[in-house]
Amino acid sequence: MKTNNSKEKVRQLQNKLYLTAKKCQKRRFHALYDKVYRDDVLIEAWKRVKANKGSSGVDGIRIEDIEKMGIEKYLKELKKELIEGKYIPSPVKRVMIPKPDGSERPLGIPTVRDRIVQMAAKIAIEPVFEADFRECSYGFRPKRSAKQALEVV
């Protein structure tokens, strides 16, 4: 697993998926799963999860623990599970977060492993959906904000 140009390869993959989806709006993408376990996608997913920090899930494994184990080894094992259909998401760790009014709200914290897979899936499917979204849509989209939506209105 080479990490040096994963970002560029992922950008090219996403651009290709976006352009294909934009060109053929009736096209259905039946085979995106193989994109999730690509080396470059898993490496980029790892980098994004690591940059986002966050605490460990129910397994207690932290980002630092994975770095000590060896990122390449960890991602190879995860890739193998995904390819063989043996990947099973872990339960979510439930933490109660205090609200300003004194009550609490539940927060679910997935394991780092599950966050990597979720991010890899996001990397694969996001450009397909982006191609269908309208220009006037701003909610929860990359490189768009509430401020930009207000400027348009």
Name every feature range the model reports, one short phrase each:
Residues K2-V153:
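Conserved pre-catalytic core of RNA-dependent polymerases
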